[in-house]
Amino acid sequence: MRSISLMFLKRKKFWKRTFWFGLITPIIVFSILVLVVYVKQDSIVKNLIKNANKDFTGSIRIKDSHVAPFANFPYISIDIEELEIFEGKNRKKSERIVHIKDAYIGFDILELLSGKYDVKSVRLSNGDLRIIQHKNGDFNIIKAFESKKPAKEIEEELHLDLQSIKLDNIDVSKFNESNGIMVDVLIENAKTRLQSTKQNFTMNVDSKFQLNLIKDGDTTFLKHKHFEVATELDFEKSKQILKVEPTEITLEKATFNFDGSVDFLNDVFIDLHFKH
């Protein structure tokens, strides 16, 4: 009877140790990874900004950065505070295109273990994006991101391997200097999942936003219109065809659906099918 009792106690201790080992090990590993990111965050952020300012016509400026391990879970993130992007190098406020209070760049936990620091996710929270179409037809944001280097080389330098983008409370406006028309979109929240292969580029989007159309400083009939959009886009690289999978759009209380395609090699032929 005593031997049975001893065996029971041994098994109990074994399972208790196994339980605590299984519970504590992931916490220790996660803590170590957070510590690694904390130690290297300055060099990671400085290299990203240095390469971006070197590669692009525009310029980037930030206030500070810190580790935010749960801001974009399951990715371990660095919070870049007060991110600003300018059209040129002189950083005039009049040429500021982007101002984001918190920009979280996320890294995959498993890849960190192997020493890779590719940016897997971006989450932008509270800020604005001001797109201007100049009278000569140029866009300030396109000019800011002009580069003499191939896109693939830039991706490698910036360690970009984006799989998701999230937006929270981002005000996006596009102003046309020629006709004085401004389209303003207040994005309450948006989630985008990205997947790229040699053949296709796929993007899933779920978003809620408000739309305003402004002419010469005055709002038009499009004022504070609430939209919800859920769609999937699939771009076939070889055929240059964009497939629009079944999409649902809600405008105020009305909902409609559509799907179709855009053929860029055939004079940008648009073929959309709407459903009630």
Task: Please state what every model-predicted region is.
Residues K93-V98, N200, D206-Q240:
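Beta-propeller and related beta-repeat scaffolds in trafficking/envelope systems
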Residues D64-I76:
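Short edge beta-strands and adjacent turn/loop segments
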Residues T250-T255:
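Solvent-exposed loop/turn segments connecting transmembrane beta-strands
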Residues R2-F14, G58, P74-S77, E81-N200, ...:
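Secondary-structure transition motifs
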Residues N53-I62, K239:
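Short secondary-structure junctions
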Residues R2-T57:
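N-terminal type II signal-anchor transmembrane helix
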Residues D259-S261:
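Short, T/G/N/S-enriched strand-turn elements that build extracellular solenoid repeat scaffolds
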Residues I170-V172, Q240-I249:
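Transmembrane beta-strand segments that form the barrel wall of outer-membrane beta-barrel proteins
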